[in-house]
Amino acid sequence: SKKTLEKTHIEKKSLNTKEKIDIAKKACSLIKDGDTIFIGPGTTLEQLALELKGRKGYKIRVITNSLPVFLILNDSETIDLLLLGGEYREITGAFVGSMASTNLKAMRFAKAFVSANAVTHNSIATYSDKEGVIQQLSLNNAVEKFLLVDSTKFDRYDFFNFYDLDQLDTIITDNQISPQHLEEFSQYTTILKAD
């Protein structure tokens, strides 16, 4: 099999698990009854799906291009679920490409939750340009735009810049973020630290 620079889903799942749970809990607390939301691919966002699934008394609609997110939520009785189809990227479990893009363009969300591999200066980056394009579209079509990243992602680089930080409403990260990073990235957008 060909070697890749991109970490696999399994590799990512075991990294910074506590931080991801904290971030997911914080994000979950911002989702209101009746919201229509987009959840992108990534292990932090899968954790958000788990938090949503365990929540009682809320009826929401979730659109996702992540097969793992879909599989977490597909037997929930309180979540209307829509999976965007398209070209499948096995390494992250995401559907991408023109079919996913075309469907996404017609949709609007109260909130979009995406993740990234790297946050540097005023930009957010990921390894795959195809995944980046889908994340970009979902953010463009959302009233409120959220980036969920653990504190190890700041001042990191990756291949494809898909959004500017100052176009986001909020970054949700863990409480291990350094004071320097908090100060630096707060000039672009609001940073919420998980409890």
Give a label for each model feature.
Residues S1-P41, L50-G57, N74-T78:
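HTH-adjacent hinge/linker in prokaryotic transcriptional regulators
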Residues L15-I23, N65, V96, K130:
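Short secondary-structure boundary/capping elements
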Residues G34, G57-K59, A142, L168:
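A general structural motif
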Residues I37-F38, V62, Y127:
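Conserved SAM-binding loop
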Residues P41-T43, N117:
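Short, well-ordered beta-to-alpha junction loops that form the rim of enzyme active sites
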Residues Q47-E51, E184:
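A short acidic, amphipathic alpha-helical/loop segment
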Residues L67-D195:
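Conserved phosphate- and dinucleotide-binding cores of soluble alpha/beta proteins
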